[in-house]
Amino acid sequence: DAAGTMKTGWVQAGSWYYLNASGAMQTGWVNDNGTWYYCNASGAMQTGWLLDGSTWYYLNANGSMAANTTVDGYVLGANGAML
């Protein structure tokens, strides 16, 4: 920040980004206190449908991964993957 303090956790700079304990920007899957999020290659938090490899996931408007629910008629299991 402006005072030179290293930021960690979620930071908003246009999009939301996750900075790990060493202050490095995280990409890929992020587990924050038991809730899963996904940050793309530029580090921005994703929302909506995500195809990771050959598996579909749904990320809510707040970025959290949906699980054990139905979205747009598609069933998501306990691990968030479309069944």
Task: Describe the role of every protein-language-model region.
Residues 1-83:
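Extracellular adhesion/carbohydrate-binding repeat motifs centered on closely spaced tryptophans
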